[in-house]
């Protein structure tokens, strides 16, 4: 009986997503879209945009960093929301 209960517990853990991980885009500027799973219970994705001598630059990733004046940042909370 204990073995059956242990087996059911293991199957439940394997079948359920107990550790949900947010997925964010992480490509830079106009590169081919790629994604990454965020670690440490991160709940935000970001898209940061600024202009330099090469034109507009874009950075994407996990989190919601603080930025300096002149840098546009958009933070969001759903999978792949920062494209």
From Swiss-Prot:
<keyword id="KW-0582">Pharmaceutical</keyword>
<keyword id="KW-0629">Postsynaptic neurotoxin</keyword>
<keyword id="KW-1015">Disulfide bond</keyword>
<keyword id="KW-0732">Signal</keyword>
<keyword id="KW-0008">Acetylcholine receptor inhibiting toxin</keyword>
<keyword id="KW-0800">Toxin</keyword>
<comment type="similarity">
    <text>Belongs to the three-finger toxin family. Short-chain subfamily. Type I alpha-neurotoxin sub-subfamily.</text>
</comment>
<feature type="site" description="May be critical for toxicity">
    <location>
        <position position="54"/>
    </location>
</feature>
<dbReference type="GO" id="GO:0030550">
    <property type="term" value="F:acetylcholine receptor inhibitor activity"/>
</dbReference>
<protein>
    <recommendedName>
        <fullName>Cobrotoxin</fullName>
    </recommendedName>
</protein>
<dbReference type="GO" id="GO:0005576">
    <property type="term" value="C:extracellular region"/>
</dbReference>
<dbReference type="InterPro" id="IPR054131">
    <property type="entry name" value="Toxin_cobra-type"/>
</dbReference>
<comment type="function">
    <text>Binds to muscle nicotinic acetylcholine receptor (nAChR) and inhibit acetylcholine from binding to the receptor, thereby impairing neuromuscular transmission. Has a higher toxicity than cobrotoxin-b. In vivo, when tested on rat arthritis models, shows anti-inflammation and immunosuppression effects.</text>
</comment>
<feature type="disulfide bond">
    <location>
        <begin position="38"/>
        <end position="62"/>
    </location>
</feature>
<dbReference type="InterPro" id="IPR018354">
    <property type="entry name" value="Snake_toxin_con_site"/>
</dbReference>
<feature type="disulfide bond">
    <location>
        <begin position="64"/>
        <end position="75"/>
    </location>
</feature>
<feature type="site" description="May be critical for toxicity">
    <location>
        <position position="57"/>
    </location>
</feature>
<keyword id="KW-0872">Ion channel impairing toxin</keyword>
<dbReference type="GO" id="GO:0090729">
    <property type="term" value="F:toxin activity"/>
</dbReference>
<keyword id="KW-0528">Neurotoxin</keyword>
<dbReference type="InterPro" id="IPR045860">
    <property type="entry name" value="Snake_toxin-like_sf"/>
</dbReference>
<feature type="signal peptide">
    <location>
        <begin position="1"/>
        <end position="21"/>
    </location>
</feature>
<feature type="disulfide bond">
    <location>
        <begin position="76"/>
        <end position="81"/>
    </location>
</feature>
<keyword id="KW-0964">Secreted</keyword>
<feature type="disulfide bond">
    <location>
        <begin position="24"/>
        <end position="45"/>
    </location>
</feature>
<dbReference type="InterPro" id="IPR003571">
    <property type="entry name" value="Snake_3FTx"/>
</dbReference>
<dbReference type="Pfam" id="PF21947">
    <property type="entry name" value="Toxin_cobra-type"/>
</dbReference>
<dbReference type="GO" id="GO:0099106">
    <property type="term" value="F:ion channel regulator activity"/>
</dbReference>
